[in-house]
Amino acid sequence: MDFDSAGVRLHYELHGPEDGPPIVLVHGFASDYQLNWVGTRWQETLTKAGHRVIGLDCRGHGSSDKPHDPAAYALEIMAADVRRLLGHLHIETANYLGYSMGAKIGLQAMVDFPKRVGRVVLGGIGWGGAFRAAQEIAKALRGGPIESPVAKTFYDFAKGRASNDLEALAACILGPQPEPDSAALAKITNPVLVVVGDEDDIVAEVDRFIEHLPTAKLVTIAGRNHMSAVPAGEFKKAALEFLEA
């Protein structure tokens, strides 16, 4: 299914009981709903637990439109896509699960429209991370030299998905996505669960991030990196317990 978000066509999916508590799932950079949440059995886990899953393909990804202008990927714009999706579905408030880029979008959602999101699970996020290497990643995606391990990780991941538009992904990584604002984080009142693998070398300064987010609880998954943390059973267990608290 598709909807219009201020002139950009975005794809979404609905799964699970119609009367279940709604939860929006937002994937990471160069991924999409199917890759991030279906193959990893998150959709199955949440729907079996009675949740109404709303899966979004972010702009630039999956089956959604793929603009080539970095300005189209400002964090506020990508968060507004989530708000418009809730409006399209006539949902006043929904829980939220986001990973990596999707976690940054969820963070922005709590700043911009906190009453539209309930309990929020943020995975694979810290104070900085891959977006600090945006220029290197974009250069690699555009066929230039690979100048860092982070750029190689994201280039290999992006190239591995035939549906990816590498120019759109380069625009996305170059979009206006500043580091968290400590004053804005301090005002967040939504309950937040942060989940990070202890071998994640993509995110940075997780402890600093948690210190500035007073409502957050941190769960660290042993032996998992940025990619392998997503399907971890410990991640699913912690998220379900948090969502159903």
Language-model features: locations:
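Active-site loop/oxyanion-hole signature of alpha/beta-hydrolase fold enzymes
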Residues: 38, 44-48, 55-95
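Short alpha-helix in the alpha/beta-hydrolase fold that links the catalytic acid
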Residues: 39, 190, 203-211
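Conserved hydrolase catalytic core segment
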Residues: 92-130
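Active-site nucleophile elbow and catalytic-triad environment of alpha/beta-hydrolase enzymes
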Residues: 168-184, 199-201
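Short beta-strand/loop motif that positions the catalytic acidic residue
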Residues: 188, 194-196
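Catalytic histidine neighborhood in serine/cysteine hydrolases
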Residues: 210-227
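Catalytic histidine-centered segment of alpha/beta-hydrolase-like enzymes
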Residues: 224-236
